[in-house]
Amino acid sequence: MDVVIMAAGKGTRMKSKLPKVLHLLAGRALLQHVVDTAAQLSARQVVVITGHGAMEVEAAVSGNTGASAGFDINFVRQEPQLGTGHAVQQAVPLLRDDGMVVVLSGDVPLIQAATLRHLIAAAGTDKLALLTIDFADPTGYGRIVRRGDVVQAIVEQKDATPVQREITEVYSGIMALPARQLKAWLARLDKQNAQGEYYLTDIVKFAVADGVPVVAHKIADATQVAGVNSPVQLAALERAFQSKVALQLMEQGVRLADPARLDVRGQLHCAQDVSIDVNCVFEGVVTLGEGVKIGANCVIRNATIAAGAVIHPFTHIEGGQPGSKDAVEVGAGALIGPFARLRPGAKLGQAVHIGNFVEVKNSTLARGAKANHLAYLGDATVGERVNYGAGSITANYDGAFKHRTVLEADVHIGSNCVLIAPLTIGAGGTVGGGSTVTKDTPPGALTVARAKQVSIANWKRPSK
C-alpha cells in the first residue's frame, strides 16, 4: 500500500510566508501530523506532493520517521497547480499497479490511523472507499450524491445545483482505492468545470461508469476531517486537540486545575496522583512520576521528573533530545522553583533544592544538594548535601572552551562567589562569601579569596 499526501497549496488565507502545511499544531507541523499517522499504516511508501514552498516543505519532513518506520518518504512537485486531480497525477510514476493507495490531505492533521484502517478495510482490494461526514453547514465541501443508498458522484460546491447544495453528507478529501484503477481514472480527467481544474473527485463518476463499487465510510468526529485554511481554523483545531488530550489525562487520574489551560506539544506520560496547575506547556517527551506536582505557568521540555518532586510556578525546564545526555532529570522529592531554569544536561538527584532565579546547565547535583537563590551552575558536578550560596556562579567558559567545576560532598559555598573552572572544591570545604576562587582547595578547608576590607574615615564623595 502507498500513501499519497497532497501538500502543494499556498494557504492564502493564512496570510503568512510560511507554507500552510508547516504551520504548527500542538508543536508539530500540520503535515508532520499526517506523515506520522501514515507511519502507522504499514505503508510501503509515502509520497508527498509539494508545490508552494516545496523546498521548505521537503526539508521539514525529510528523514522524519520514514526509514525507522519501514517505508520511504518521496516527494513530487505539482507545478503549476491545476487542481487536486492534477496533484495526484504527479505521484502516478511512483505508485505500484498491484497495490492500494490512500489519499490524504496535508492540512487535515488530526485524522486517526484507526479511522484510516476502517476505510482501507472498506475498500478491500477492488472498491473505491470515500471518507465522509455529515455537516449541518456543508458550505465549501464536495457533496456526496447518491441514487438511493448508492454513491453516484461527488459534486464540488461551485458546480453543485441548488438541490445538491442541500445535501449535508460531504467528502472529507480522504479516499482509498486500487492503484491500477486510480491511474486509469486520473488519465481520463478534464477541466470542464466551474473552476477550470482537474478534480480528483471526478474519479467517482468514472468508477460508477466502470462498475467499480463506491462505498462511503461515514464518521461522526468532525475534528478528524477538519482542514486548516486560516489562523482562526488553526486555533480552533488546536483547542480541540488539547481538549482531547486533557480529557485523556484526567481519565488516567491526572488532576488538572483547568483542562482548558493546558498545552501538550508532544508526549506527556503521567503516573498516579500527578497534579498540574494552569497554563503549563509540555513539549517533546515529558514523564511525571507518582505524586509529582507542577505549579502554574511552567514550561517543561524533554524531562523526566521522579516521584514526589514539586515544580513550583514559572519554572522553565529545557531538556535536549529524549534519551540523550541533554535530557533533564529531576530526582524524587526534589523542589524546583519558583522562577528556576533547568537547561540541557541538568541531572538532579533525590531531594535536591533549586530555588528562585537559579539556572542549572549540563550539571549533576547529588542527593540533598541545594542552590536556593540567584545562582548559576554550569558544567558542574555537585556532591551530596552541598549548599550553594546566593549570587554565586561557576565561570565555566574561557571564550573558547567549557571547563568543569567539581564541588565534593558537604561543600558550603558562601554568597556571591565566583568559581573559575577548571576547579575542584574538596569535600567538606567552605568558600567564604564574595570569594573568587581560581585554584583547587583541600578537603575541610575554609577558603577566602577576596580583597582586604578597608574603611577610610571621613571620606568625602566627589561633588559637582
From Swiss-Prot:
List the catalytic residues. Answer: 373 (proton acceptor)
Stretches for region Pyrophosphorylase = 1-231
This protein's cofactor list reads:
Mg(2+)
Name a biological process GO annotation: cell morphogenesis
Q: Which residues bind Mg(2+)?
A: 107, 229
Chain intervals for the UniProt region annotation (N-acetyltransferase) = 253-464
Q: How is the co-factor bound, per the entry?
A: Binds 1 Mg(2+) ion per subunit.
Reactions catalysed: alpha-D-glucosamine 1-phosphate + acetyl-CoA = N-acetyl-alpha-D-glucosamine 1-phosphate + CoA + H(+); N-acetyl-alpha-D-glucosamine 1-phosphate + UTP + H(+) = UDP-N-acetyl-alpha-D-glucosamine + diphosphate
GO cellular component labels:
cytoplasm; membrane
Q: Give the primary localization class.
A: cytoplasm
EC numbers: 2.7.7.23, 2.3.1.157
The record's annotation in Pfam families points to:
NTP_transf_3
- Where found? Cytoplasm
Give the protein's function: Catalyzes the last two sequential reactions in the de novo biosynthetic pathway for UDP-N-acetylglucosamine (UDP-GlcNAc). The C-terminal domain catalyzes the transfer of acetyl group from acetyl coenzyme A to glucosamine-1-phosphate (GlcN-1-P) to produce N-acetylglucosamine-1-phosphate (GlcNAc-1-P), which is converted into UDP-GlcNAc by the transfer of uridine 5-monophosphate (from uridine 5-triphosphate), a reaction catalyzed by the N-terminal domain.
Q: Report the protein name in the record.
A: Bifunctional protein GlmU
